[in-house]
């Protein structure tokens, strides 16, 4: 994940996930598309600071994969001043079998954090099932004394959790995805 990475080719700042081969060859990047902003006119927030590049997929060890960043997947209605373009479905239509979902969600100890958690998790599972894709979401871990804003783990193409990390603190997990399943 490269937040505020300025690409040398165009000089623009992107919030991005970068893809490399196992040998370190750079394949390209996905930039956050549904950038957060206020619902005012004009909107204010990261929507004013980050550029967007076209949605694309990548070949990793012969598997078509894609990436989404945080709000790209769930299009939170409280901070998405543009239409929900259903990026999970678009990646599925482009042939993606696995989507890596990088999350840097806000969190707190309030009831509203519980509402956001439920919204994030249900969107994640429903969009994986609707697109028939595997989704690997990973949220940041700070502050470590609060539950993350969305579960981290692996959701299969039927929308079911097959691996899930503990919800507080820095965690590690691994899971072998069987695409023939």
PLM region spans:
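Short beta-strand scaffold segments in enzyme catalytic cores
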Residues: 3, 15-19, 56-57, 152-154, ...
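CN hydrolase (nitrilase-like) catalytic-core segments centered on the catalytic cysteine
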Residues: 1-2, 74-172
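A short C-terminal boundary segment appended to hydrolase-like catalytic domains
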Residues: 177-181
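Hydrophobic residues at beta-strand termini and immediately following loops
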Residues: 30, 58, 138, 165, ...
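Active-site catalytic loop in hydrolytic enzyme cores
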Residues: 8-98, 102-103, 112, 116-119
């Amino acid at each position: 994940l490269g937040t505020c990475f300025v690409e040398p080719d165009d000089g623009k700042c992107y919030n991005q996930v970068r893809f490399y081969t196992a040998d370190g060859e750079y394949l390209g990047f996905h930039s956050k598309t549904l950038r957060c902003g206020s619902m005012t006119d004009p909107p204010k927030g990261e929507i004013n600071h980050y550029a967007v590049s076209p949605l694309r997929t990548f070949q990793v060890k012969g598997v078509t994969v894609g990436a989404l960043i945080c709000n790209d997947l769930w299009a939170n209605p409280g901070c998405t001043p543009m239409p929900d373009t259903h990026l999970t479905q678009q990646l599925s239509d482009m042939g993606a079998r696995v989507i890596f979902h990088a999350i840097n969600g806000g969190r707190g100890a309030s009831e509203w954090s519980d509402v956001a958690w439920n919204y994030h998790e249900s969107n994640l599972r429903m969009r994986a099932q609707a697109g028939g894709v595997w989704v690997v979401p990973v949220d940041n871990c700070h502050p470590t004394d609060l539950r993350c804003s969305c579960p981290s783990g692996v959701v299969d193409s039927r929308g079911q959790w097959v691996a899930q990390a503990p919800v507080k603190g820095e965690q590690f997990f691994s899971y072998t995805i069987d695409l023939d399943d």
